[in-house]
């Protein structure tokens, strides 16, 4: 089973009196996530299930990924992906989805890095991982239990995903 860990795109700055969960992606954030998702698609990444934090910026990121993938799969909210959720609880909440071959999760830092570390080393502090906004990590989970250690297959920054998407698009477009 492959777990794709996706950090949400660039979001609006938080105003002092504003609800953090209501922050939306900026126009630049939307454009960059769309380009990064095109890179994922060019790499052959598939999603049987796409789970998202209920926070607006993560849900918007998941919706853009789905759009780039032709409307499937429809993102599902998973409250355990909310900002500040303990990584052990989040991994436990992923258990019912491990029967699928390709699962994507969209969420927030530092939780996503802690999930990657937990799955690879057994501890949320077991390794230093940093997911920039729009980054994606691919983990190979052995067996159906998140307690088995995962293998980090790759971790790509958003700029690399955008380049991959652009290079494939250039090859597919006819010369003028």
What does each model-found stretch correspond to?
Residues 2-85, 92, 131, 167-176:
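Active-site-proximal alpha-helix that buttresses catalytic centers in soluble enzyme cores
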Residues 3, 99-107:
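Generic beta-sheet signal
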Residues 43-45, 96-101:
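Glycine-rich phosphate-binding loop signature in dinucleotide/nucleotide-binding domains
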Residues 123-151, 155-158:
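Domain-level recognition of soluble alpha/beta enzyme cores
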Residues 148, 152-176:
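Charged phosphate-binding loop/patch that engages nucleotide di/tri-phosphates or the phosphate backbone
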């Amino acid at each position: 089973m492959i777990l794709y860990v996706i950090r949400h795109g660039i979001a609006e700055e938080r105003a002092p009196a504003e609800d953090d969960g209501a922050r939306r992606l900026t126009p630049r954030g939307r454009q960059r996530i769309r380009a990064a998702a095109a890179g994922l698609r060019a790499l052959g990444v598939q999603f049987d299930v796409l789970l998202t934090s209920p926070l607006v910026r993560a849900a918007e990121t998941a919706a853009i990924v789905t759009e780039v993938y032709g409307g499937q799969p429809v993102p599902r909210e998973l409250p355990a992906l909310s900002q500040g959720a303990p990584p052990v609880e989040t991994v436990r909440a992923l258990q019912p989805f491990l029967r699928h071959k390709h699962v994507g999760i969209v969420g927030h830092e530092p939780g996503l890095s802690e999930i990657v570390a937990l799955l690879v080393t057994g501890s949320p502090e077991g390794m230093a991982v940093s997911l920039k906004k729009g980054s994606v990590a691919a983990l190979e989970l052995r067996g159906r239990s998140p307690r088995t250690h995962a293998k980090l297959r790759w971790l790509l920054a958003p700029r690399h995903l955008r380049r991959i998407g652009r290079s494939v698009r250039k090859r597919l477009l006819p010369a003028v």
